[in-house]
């Protein structure tokens, strides 16, 4: 998801999405270890989404506007 799309969500919604993505990342890592994950690039995309959400939340915390 793009950062501009994520800006529209509230902090609570972003925190919920962050929790869901962390769970998804954990599941993907387990699948990778068990050799059941066929598309390993999914891990990269989930990690990037987590970073985007954390960046937006931190920016709001500091009062940074873009």
UniProtKB/Swiss-Prot annotation:
Q: Mind naming one GO cellular-component term on file for this protein?
A: cytosolic large ribosomal subunit
The Gene Ontology biological process terms listed for this entry are: translation
Fetch the SUPFAM superfamilies from UniProt: Ribosomal protein L29 (L29p)
Q: Which UniProt keywords apply?
A: Ribonucleoprotein, Ribosomal protein
- Ribosomal protein is among the record's keywords: yes
Gene behind the chain: rpmC
User: What is the similarity comment for this entry?
Assistant: Belongs to the universal ribosomal protein uL29 family.
Identify a single GO molecular function assigned to this protein.
structural constituent of ribosome
Q: Which Gene3D superfamilies does this one have?
A: 1.10.287.310
Organism domain of life? Bacteria
Return the InterPro entries for the record: Ribosomal_protein_uL29 (IPR050063), Ribosomal_uL29 (IPR001854), Ribosomal_uL29_CS (IPR018254), Ribosomal_uL29_sf (IPR036049)
What protein name is recorded for this chain?
Answer: Large ribosomal subunit protein uL29
Report the CDD domains cross-referenced here. Answer: Ribosomal_L29_HIP
